[in-house]
């Protein structure tokens, strides 16, 4: 279930790049989603999940504005939907 960062980003960029942060947040979202399927009344975990989703969304918005090609590549590799644009 863990996401292999070497498939997505280079060795130099693994530490704190936007791409690696999005990958780690996606992994945490998947883990919390599985947890909430078992424990549907765990409201504090649900609140934490919403917080992580908002953080990932803001990083994805930042990535679309600064490096759209990298954004396209990342969402295709992670299996995410495109952001809604107004």
Curated annotation (Swiss-Prot):
Superkingdom field: Eukaryota
Recorded coiled-coil stretches: none
Gene Ontology molecular function, alphabetical: structural constituent of ribosome
SUPFAM superfamilies in the record: S15/NS1 RNA-binding domain
Protein's name in the database: Small ribosomal subunit protein uS15c
Family: Belongs to the universal ribosomal protein uS15 family.
CDD domains, per the entry: S15_NS1_EPRS_RNA-bind
Cellular compartments annotated: Plastid, Chloroplast
Biological process according to GO: translation
CC per GO annotation: chloroplast; ribonucleoprotein complex; ribosome
InterPro entries in the record: Ribosomal_uS15, Ribosomal_uS15_bac-type, uS15_NS1_RNA-bd_sf
Entry's transmembrane regions: none
Disulfide links within the chain: none
Alphabetical keyword list: Chloroplast, Plastid, Ribonucleoprotein, Ribosomal protein
Summary of subunit composition and partner proteins: Part of the 30S ribosomal subunit.
Main localisation: plastid
